[in-house]
């Protein structure tokens, strides 16, 4: 998995006044958990989080402080301003290469489902999978091949198993499925109506003609 570097500096004060001053200066107050002792409070420029926050992708983080310390981490929580969507606060959690971590990884579909080619629609139940594994083994995204799915068929999480991570969902969890589209249903209904009309009209005419002939023969 790709890693993004965040350059920051330790916070000398964590009070409300100091936090407000940081935000006014374009800085984001952050906390790193999982370190020895107390959580580490630091701040970094808001623009440095652009490729970490405003993206559908996920990354690990390398936090580098001006004092020289460096930490590997993952984003744990983020708070946004309710009106401006500006980043108010970010929590990180320190990770270690030899210890497994749990993350939500994006799903990328591959191929065109057979059912879609026949008029169906691919519906997603999940866009990300929660998996657990070593940081170095976790992928940037998980590939889900849907090319063999027919209308009515589903792709389960067991279809994207990997030796590199353990999926944290029940085996019967559905990633996506091919369903009949509304247009296809309407078209099939119209075809059935036409068949019913034809079936009602033709046999009725033949029966009426035969009955008329027999009736004429009886009178003679």
Swiss-Prot record:
Q: Which InterPro entries match?
A: Rbsml_bL25/Gln-tRNA_synth_N, Ribosomal_bL25/Gln-tRNA_synth, Ribosomal_bL25_b-dom, Ribosomal_bL25_C, Ribosomal_bL25_long, Ribosomal_L25_dom, Ribosomal_uL5_bac-type
GO terms (molecular function) for this protein are:
5S rRNA binding; structural constituent of ribosome
- Which keywords does UniProt give here? Ribonucleoprotein, Ribosomal protein, RNA-binding, rRNA-binding
Q: Which GO terms describe its biological process?
A: translation
Output compositional bias ranges, type Basic and acidic residues. 211-220
Compositionally biased region (Acidic residues): 186-199
Which is one Pfam family of this protein?
A: Ribosomal_L25p
Which GO cellular component terms, listed alphabetically, does the Swiss-Prot or TrEMBL entry include? cytosolic large ribosomal subunit
Q: Which SUPFAM superfamilies match?
A: Ribosomal protein L25-like
Q: According to the UniProt record, where is the region Disordered?
A: 186-220
How it assembles, according to the record, is:
Part of the 50S ribosomal subunit; part of the 5S rRNA/L5/L18/L25 subcomplex. Contacts the 5S rRNA. Binds to the 5S rRNA independently of L5 and L18.
Show the NCBIfam families listed in the entry.
Answer: bL25_bact_ctc, PRK05618.2-2
What role is this protein assigned? This is one of the proteins that binds to the 5S RNA in the ribosome where it forms part of the central protuberance.
Q: In which family does this protein belong, per the annotation?
A: Belongs to the bacterial ribosomal protein bL25 family. CTC subfamily.
What is the protein name for this chain?
Answer: Large ribosomal subunit protein bL25
């Amino acid at each position: 998995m790709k890693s993004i570097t965040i350059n920051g500096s330790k916070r000398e004060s964590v009070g409300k006044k100091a936090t407000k001053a940081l935000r006014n200066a374009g800085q984001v107050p952050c906390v790193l958990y999982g370190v020895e002792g107390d959580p580490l409070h630091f701040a970094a420029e808001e623009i440095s989080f652009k490729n970490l926050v405003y993206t559908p992708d996920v990354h690990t983080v390398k936090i580098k402080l001006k004092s020289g310390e460096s930490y590997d981490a993952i984003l744990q929580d983020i708070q946004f301003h309710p009106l401006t969507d500006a980043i108010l606060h970010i929590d990180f959690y320190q990770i270690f290469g030899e210890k497994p971590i749990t993350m939500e990884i994006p799903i990328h579909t591959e191929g065109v489902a057979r059912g879609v080619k026949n008029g169906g629609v691919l519906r997603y139940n999940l866009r990300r999978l929660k998996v657990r594994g070593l940081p170095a083994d976790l992928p940037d995204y998980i590939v889900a091949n849907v090319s063999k799915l027919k209308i009515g068929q589903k792709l389960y999480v067991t279809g994207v198993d990997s030796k590199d991570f353990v999926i944290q969902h029940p085996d019967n969890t559905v990633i996506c499925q091919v369903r009949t589209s509304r247009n296809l249903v309407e078209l099939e209904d119209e075809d059935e109506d036409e068949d019913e009309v034809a079936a009602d009209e033709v046999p009725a005419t033949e029966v009426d003609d035969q009955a008329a002939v027999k009736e004429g023969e009886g009178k003679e």
